[in-house]
Amino acid sequence: MTFPSLSVSFLFFAFIFVTHAFDLSIIQMQQGTCPYTVVVMTSCLSPESTRDQISIVFGDADGNKVYAPKLGGLVRGPGGLGKCSTNTFQVRGQCLNDPICSLYINRNGPDGWVPESIEIYSEGSKSVKFDFSKSVPQLNTWYGHNNCNTTGRPSSPDLPPPHFPPEFPPETPTTPPPPPPRPSAASRLGNGESVFLAFAIATAIAAMVRWSY
């Protein structure tokens, strides 16, 4: 007798769940977030490994941009953005119009990381590849390509250079403190030895005094 009521309850909760999921998808579409795949090829002129922090920003001709900070920090273990390596990153950001026509790099670190190319993949669009001709980005400045407007001078992104706390050790180790001075002979004696030595000296002095009389 309770099966029909259970079926009605199940259908009701299923309807609520589907409606909620549909509302979430609508909210995500309204927010305009899209997934992107970023493939970074590091030049063979780059160091074997790097502590540099690499950020990128790419955009379309309408001025929409996607900012992906600290790509190097997403790679764990050896080989991350190292010499001759290829690393893939999943980035989510504002939905861009086709085609993606600008990409800039920001490098912050001591190692001089050298990019070979960066390729951007987006859903339903052809990938776009930006070659960097093995040139090193200047330290903590935006460097890259803007193919969105071929009639005007390419402009750098209107973003300040990212400021990250350094996660790399200093290039040269700090000078170690000088060793402590060596203890004197008296300081090396324990309390018992000091008392015995004082008693022996006092006894010798007393004997010398008696012999003098």
From Swiss-Prot:
CDD domains: PLAT. Residues 147-188 are annotated as: Disordered. It comes from the Eukaryota. InterPro entries: Embryo-specific_ATS3, PLAT/LH2_dom_sf. Expressed in seeds. Expression is restricted to the developing embryo. Glycans are attached at N149. It is found in: Secreted. Residues 1-21 form the signal peptide. Residues 34-148 form the PLAT domain. The keyword Nucleotide-binding does not apply. GO terms for cellular component: extracellular region. Residues 157-183 have a biased composition (Pro residues). Its main location: secreted. GO terms for biological process: embryo development ending in seed dormancy. Keywords: Glycoprotein, Secreted, Signal. Pfam families: ATS3 (PF06232). May play a role during embryo development. This is Embryo-specific protein ATS3. It comes from Arabidopsis thaliana. The lineage of its organism: Eukaryota, Viridiplantae, Streptophyta, Embryophyta, Tracheophyta. The gene is ATS3.
